[in-house]
A protein has these predicted regions:
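Sec-dependent N-terminal signal peptides
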Residues: 4-14
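Active-site-adjacent bridging/hinge elements
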Residues: 22-25, 119
Length: 119
């Protein structure tokens, strides 16, 4: 399932990048955001997002994979069985940060050692 999510994420990322013709600068960074545990059943194992940051082009976005629809019938049962339909969302880092801080959940950022050509 994780491989499917990563594949979907990279397809979406490439689609967005090509559709908007975004060129990242030499200062761009990519990082993994690991979020702490939450009290709800769906947050018991934490969460992960991918952050793309480029101060030159004022880009600071998080691709949040593993999102799901809370209105799914039998949500908890399907979640426990691993039978939910997951999808990728994106939004500003500041919104992502404030959402997790409001829930008193830590965020650990690991900047990936990528060259500009790899980004």
């Amino acid at each position: 399932m994780t491989k499917k999510l990563l594949f979907t994420f990279f397809i979406l990322l490439n689609t967005i990048a090509f559709s908007q013709n975004i060129s990242l600068s030499e200062k761009a960074k990519v990082s993994i955001l690991t979020c702490g545990l939450g009290p709800e059943s769906y947050a018991m194992y934490g969460h992960t997002g991918i952050r793309i940051q480029d101060s030159i082009h004022a880009i600071d976005v998080v691709y949040n994979y593993g999102a799901f629809d809370f209105s799914t019938p039998n949500f908890i049962g399907r979640f426990i069985k691993g039978d939910l339909q997951y999808f990728v969302t994106n939004g500003s880092f500041i919104d992502f940060y404030y959402n997790y801080q409001a829930e008193n959940r830590e965020i650990i950022e690991q900047v990936l050692a990528l060259t500009p050509a790899q980004i």
